[in-house]
């Protein structure tokens, strides 16, 4: 609807979902694909999006935040997506822009295409926003699911543990590398 743009009501719904995740201390997973804010909603849309961003920032570092960039994401939605701890972009359709690529001088002049300015390759190699690049939406969802498997169900639980039984996986010398005293120096190259 309206190119996946976010209105006041939609930002408020997402904010309430984030509040529930914060109360239950469970990860937040945002699947982003849309054209930014709804112009016809005016400033009210931006105000509620500001509340949404504030909630995401408050959760950052306290509960895991995942962003899956599955299509073009523009404007304030791109800022929200960038707050995540883990960002996975689909190389098939994922694009991230702060403003519409159609008003970017390099694109207007024909020097670059929207793909060259904001696709998964750019954000994984140059901007650093994308942690992982997926082939398509299904691959991005699979990657997020795999990452979630390394985390506990909520932030107060212990992470999952799977003993492999392979002695080669054990490195007792790791216990000696970093001293117990945080003021004591150690060799970072080891």
Task: For the regions a language model picked out, list residue spans one by one.
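STAS-typified acidic loop motif
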Residues: 1-8
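Alpha-helix initiation/capping motif
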Residues: 7, 100, 113-119, 170, ...
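Conserved catalytic cores of soluble enzyme domains
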Residues: 32-156
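Terminal amphipathic helices with adjacent charged low-complexity linkers/tails
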Residues: 132-189
């Amino acid at each position: 609807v309206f190119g996946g743009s976010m209105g006041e009501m939609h930002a408020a719904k997402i904010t309430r979902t984030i509040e529930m995740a914060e109360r239950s201390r469970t990860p937040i997973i945002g699947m982003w694909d849309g054209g930014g804010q709804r112009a016809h909603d005016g400033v009210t849309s931006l105000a509620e999006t500001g509340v949404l961003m504030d909630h995401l920032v408050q959760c950052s570092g306290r509960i895991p935040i995942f962003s899956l960039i599955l299509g073009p994401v523009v404007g304030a939605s791109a800022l929200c997506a960038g707050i995540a701890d883990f960002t996975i972009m689909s190389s098939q359709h994922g694009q991230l822009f702060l403003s519409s690529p159609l008003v970017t001088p390099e694109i207007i002049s024909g020097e670059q295409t929207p793909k060259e300015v904001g696709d998964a390759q750019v954000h994984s190699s140059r901007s650093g926003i994308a942690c992982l690049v997926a082939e398509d939406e299904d691959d991005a969802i699979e990657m997020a699911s795999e990452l979630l498997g390394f985390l506990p169900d909520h932030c107060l639980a212990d992470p999952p543990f799977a003993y492999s039984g392979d002695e080669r996986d054990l490195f007792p010398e790791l216990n000696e590398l970093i001293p117990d005293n945080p003021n004591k120096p150690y060799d970072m190259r080891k």
